[in-house]
C-alpha cells in the first residue's frame, strides 16, 4: 500500500521546508513492467479477455489520477500553511537591538536624558510575548495537522482492509461453488459464516466524500481547534495570575483581572439567588395547594361527622319510640293477665257449689 511521508522541519521562520514524498507513483511504475512480463509469459487461452483488461486498465488510471490530484491538493494546502507569514507587532523601534539594550542596562550613564529604558523594556517584553505566542500557535497547529493526517492515513488503511476482506471471502465462496458444481451433495455452512454473510448484506454502502470539501473542513477545524486551545491557555494563565501567584504585571492589569473575577462571582451569586427565588416561589405554590387540600379534607370530615351524629340521634329516637310502644303493650298484657287470674279464682271458688247441686239432683232423681 502507498504511504505518504510528510517531513516538516521548523526554523526561526516557522516553516522553512515542506517535503511531500509519495511512493504510490513509483510503486505503480515499478509494477507495470512486471505485470506486463507476467502477462506476456502466460499462454493465451481460448477466451479473449481484452475487453476486461482494457476496463481494468482504465479504472486503474482513473484511480491513479485521482490519487495524484488529491496528493497535489494536500501538498498545496500544506505549502500555503507552511509559508504563511507570522503576524508580528512592530512595537519596538528598528534601530534598537538586544546588544544596545544590554549596554544601556549595564551602563545607565551612557543613556541619553530623553530615553526611557523602562518603556523600551516593556516594548521588548510585549514583542517577546507576541513572538512566543505566535510560535506556540504555529507549533500547535503543526502538531494538530500532523496528528490528524496520521489519523486519516490509519482510517484509510482500515477502510481498505475492510473493503478487501469481503472480496476475498466472496472469491473463496465462488471457488467452492465451482468445485462443488459437479457434485450433488448438500453444502454445510457454519454459523459464523452465515452471520458474516448477513452482516455484509445488511452493511450500508458508504457515500463518496468530495476531497475538496473534506480538506476545507479539515483545515477550518484545525484553525478552530488552535484558537480554542490558545484561548483556554490564556484563561488559565489569567486565573493563575489572579489567584495570588507572583507575576511581573502592571497594577492596572491586576485590578482588571480582580474586577473581572469579582464580576464573575457576582454573576454566579445572582444566578444562585434567582434559582433560590424560583424554588421559594414553587414551594409557596405547593404550600398553598396543600393548605387548600387540607381545608377541603377538614370540611369533608366535619360534614361526615355531623351526618353520623344526626343518623345516630335519629336511631336513638326510633329506639325510644319502640321502647315506649313495647312498654305500653307489656302493661296491657299484664292487666289482661291479672283479669284472667281473677276470673280463674272466681271460677275455682264457685266450682264446689256446682258440684253439691249436681249431687242433690242425682239423689232426688234416684228416690223418684
Curated annotation (Swiss-Prot):
Which residues lie in Low complexity bias regions? 33-56
Where do Polar residues bias regions lie? 88-100, 109-121, 239-250
Q: Which gene encodes it?
A: gkap1
- Where is this protein primarily located? Golgi
Q: Where is this region: Disordered?
A: 18-127, 152-260, 333-368
| Protein name per Swiss-Prot or TrEMBL | G kinase-anchoring protein 1
List GO BP terms, alphabetically: signal transduction
**Its job:** May play a role in the regulation of insulin-dependent IRS1 tyrosine phosphorylation in adipocytes.
This entry carries the following GO cellular component terms, namely: Golgi apparatus
InterPro entries referenced in this protein's UniProt entry, alphabetically: GKAP1
**Which residue ranges have biased composition labelled Basic residues?**
170-180
Keywords of this protein's UniProt record, alphabetized?
Coiled coil, Golgi apparatus
